Amino acid sequence: MKADIAVVGSGLAALVATRTLQQAGRNAVLIWPGLSSLYFTYATVDVLGYADDTTVQPVEQPEAGVAQLIADHPEHPYAIAGLDALRGGTALLTEWLGEAGFKWQGSLARNLLLPTAIGTPKPCCLVPDSMAAGDLRRDEPIVFCGFSGYEDFVPELAASNLARAWGRGDQTVRALRLALPGFEPGRLFTSIDLARSFENEAFRRDVATGLRAVLDDGTVRIGMPAVLGLTHDSDVHAQFENEIGHPVFEIPTLPPSVLGLRLFDRLRKHIQESGVEIIWAAPAHAAEVSDGRCRRIHLKSAGRELPIDARAYVLALEDTVDGAMRAGVHDVIDPFFHQTLAHHAVPTERTNESLFKPQPFASIGYPVTDRLQPGGEDGRPLAENVFVAGGAIAGYDPVGTKSRGGLAVATGYRAAKEAMAA
Amino acid sequence: MITEDVGTFSDTVEEAASVEACTKCTACNTVCPVARSTEIFRGPKFLGPESERYRSQPEATVTAGLDLCSGCKLCEVTCPSQVTIQEYIRRAQNKGAEEKGRTLRDWVLGHTRVLSQFGSMTAPLANIGNRNPVVRWVMERVLGIHHKRPLPAYQWMTFERWFKRHRAQAPTPTVSNASMALKRRSRGPTGPPREPGREKRTVAYFSACWVNFNERRLGEMVVHVLERNGIAVTVPKQQCCGIPAVVNSNMDLARKYGKENLRSLSALPPDVDIVASSTSCGLMLKHDYDHLLDIPGAAAIGARVYDICEYLWMLHEAGELKQDFEPVQTRVLYHAPCHLKSHGIGYPAMRLLRLIPGVVVEEVDEGCCGISGTYGVKVEKYDLSMKIGSRLFEAVKAAGSDSVLADCETCRMQVEHGSGARSAHPLEILARAYGYR
């Protein structure tokens, strides 16, 4: 199949790259190996939460923080993508979210500080409206509300953790649990089931009545796991707030993440309905290169290979979950050029025993040139017309610095611009 | 990360048993149309890879809930680790049926070709019967086929018989009035006439039961469009593709059908491409004969099978598709069948239709229609199947369109039944642009 520009991947970097191409009037085809990393990793778009993965003090101004990072680390993917790409990509994403029907807030100027499901403060840059009332720079007392039988959010744990970090004056935290109609003990359910139920008006009203009965009249805001609707989030959230009479904020939970699902489903639908073709269920597994250019990539479609001949390619795979890399016992190999991206004597070298320490596997990826082309051992591009975006770029750990979203946006945007010029 | 064979034993474990590649991410459960619509269905993650760890050949299979899986394969389309979720469910379902015995309905719905042959032979009568409330009441009681589900009408003149006559006709091309009109408007020639023996390509058309017994017109359009492009068409001897047997817990029967088809298709010269106009039948030939049914030699034939729109788009890219389209002023919706997503070829029908002047085609992206072949026919699943499709029906109604295109025949039946709109194969528009009436 022929295409102008082929974007491989289904995460935020791939979507931003595709949108950038679409807005420039280019004809992009989006190739998916499976569902998106948005399902697993995103709720908010974090640009820079911590200057490095050992600092405790959160970054207050993400744009200024990235500028400093670029000055200190000229090899960092942010430095390669450039501050303009971060600005341009963020503006594009913000506008797109609005067009796709989302209500989001935040800017590169200032981070919000939002409580996580275990009650730790986390710096976030762009966030859905339904999360914003959780900002810990505000002083109103917080009530964490969990649900009986739902173990992905333990309100008592969140409250006791948050009380340690945040608890001066009015800043009081408490926890309560509600029993939900239809979710009796013994029923196996996930946040997705809850989110579907919250779209039902009668169910929502029942929960609101139950919650009002255990709340005092005083000023308080309610922190709930993010289950307020699967597709109609902003309506559900606004209506629920009305019914409660207090501000309500959602807290991202473990996968399957309702917030990630909302974001992904709607952006995907929007881009698809505006004319971008998506090739589902076809993992890419080889690139053909001649005279320094990639001539085609091969997808595994049903029964045979589907070659894609494009003028340029954006490899916007998001590391582990998108099948960006093939990990054997000793080697991690990329699926296109079959380069060894990392070699380990034993697989345990890839991991740190402490879950909360930086994980070596997180920074495995393609070394890239200053134009985001995948680089070979000699530092020269493996192919002139291929550009890497998102988590597949080597040399950074997006988890510790809370920068996955910003890097996806900046590199996705820049890779798309480069692909148009290639 | 997915392990690929890079040379050591442990690297191949996940490839050999993809159940090991499941990371429990639950993405499959979130897209499953059945799990979305009923809380009694545990979802593909639990019934597929998670239960698979507890299944073993000598033990009895726990089948509770397995029959609720509709077989849409969206779980496999979605899985970031390429776990063959659906195949685990199908195999377990089949083993359960072998242990417990199959129902009369399993037998009947697995043998749709036999039914169709009978329905076609007795065509006007069978169709009257299928609409008769008393007959339908009996069918519901005896067979478990829901009385509200419209059954497809059979036609007495099968596609295969039509094709024989078509072949026997003089090779003079039929120039329709429309293309005459086109000539008068001097928009150029309408393409060369059919010249038997001089075609560059030969295509074997796997028309499948649907076209043969129910929608001959679609087969005629396929032949028209291919011949219009200077391609010789043959219709090889064929059997049911086997998918009704697979989804009604009879994989042995499906395998028998598959072997018959492969025997016939293997006899074709190696340069003949095989084309199918039924999404799911094409997927059986391409992929499931080899992967699910393990039929020897299936991979080589599967690699030669194309969906009709996929094939035509390939011709277009090779510069071999005639572009002398008559404008078709129409605004249509397109519904992408779940099994088309499993093909991994994108949406070639939409690309093709956008070549035709006047055609505005918009995708209605509301997921599964709910019928899944024989699934939505069953008395205990009819309501569920309509609930699954309700988002699609609402979207079609909201779009105010009275015409929805879909490559899959049972999707078309369901869209018509649920939304009241007319539904056709995308080829209908293409054939019209080529002057077919």
Where are these regions (language model features)?
Chain B
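Short, intrinsically disordered, charge-biased short linear motifs at domain edges
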Residues: 7-19, 55-66, 226-229, 354-358
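Cysteine-centered iron-sulfur cluster-binding motifs in ferredoxin-type domains/subunits
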Residues: 16-35, 61-83, 116, 213, ...
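Short secondary-structure boundary segments
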Residues: 33-36, 42, 67, 73, ...
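Non-heme iron-sulfur electron-transfer modules
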Residues: 1-7, 11, 34-64, 82-107, ...
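Iron-sulfur cluster-binding electron-transfer modules in prokaryotic oxidoreductases
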Residues: 85-437
